[in-house]
Amino acid sequence: MKPISFSFRSGILFLLFSILFFSGWSQEKTKIKTKGPAHKDTMVMHVSPLDTLVIERILGMKGKFNNGEYKVTIPQNDLSVEVDGFKIIPAMGLGTWVDFAASSDGAMIMGDLVLTENDLKPVQQEIIRQGLTISAIHNHFIRNHPNVMYMHLGGSGSLEQVAQKVKAVLDKIKEVRGGDPSKGTASNEAVPNSLDTRQLDTIVGYKAEMSKGVYKYTIGRPDVSLKEHGVTVTTFMGFNTWAAFQGSPDHAAVAGDFTMLENEVPLVIKALVEHGIEVVAVHNHMVHEQPRIFFLHYWGVGNALQLAQGLRAALDQTSRKNNSMSGMHMNP
């Protein structure tokens, strides 16, 4: 047997070296690919459950726990607001709320503050001073007396730090108003309601809850997986459509909020307007959400069943998965 030539041995060594080199390069390339934003979206975040006792201790109030989230709500009982002769009470959308959700750095908050025109500037300044963010300022009503605005805030950090920041903002509202909004009595009474709620449920396709004369639907979007900074935004956290009815069968009022994907916006507006319901605001609530979501506030006065038909027509312009009683979501 002839000995293996030098050139043949060199070829074998070169082939082995090439295989090892390209195999290692491929693995390194794969590692590099996983370092971008896309990897962050798919990365499993390790989060600790919220310690609700910390929130309660710092804020000095109790909230409601739901599927790992904790929400505090402050009814604005010190504000006496009317629109077109209808009294707007907290159940009709006159309530400040802040939701806490567990996140990788401790907690993420989202909230909606009810503010008077005099509150707006000092509360804005306090939010920025605390290192929180403002993501939306808008109205819910028109022709309302006095005029009220709604300001959305957000932030994240350790649970204790975030709760302390929220406390500072809520304390600023008390300071400017000259008292605790929840302790007032101006909006703390029931409104008249003689509506046929069964007929409303049949038309709208959902069941609602009655609170002090306000019959309110809260409808989630289970067809949309919404995230803000990697944290899931739920119905409980404000990702929902709602409608609040009061009054009599022939003279009712409905106020509410629609949540919409961008392509649904013109369709929902058209359906509401064609049914005589005023669209009073179109806006965002968040700025880093995925996918992009818009919100719309509306106000209608008239025959209760006709208003419900208008609401149903607008709902039909959103996800078809959301159009049956099986998808019912009760009020948060």
Set out the residue ranges of the language-model regions:
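Bacterial N-terminal signal peptides
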Residues: G11-F21
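Bacterial Sec-dependent signal peptides at the C-terminal "C-region" and cleavage site
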Residues: F22-K29
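Bacterial N-terminal signal peptides that target proteins for export
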Residues: K2-I12
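Long, contiguous binding/interaction regions
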Residues: K29-N147, G154-I293, W299-P332
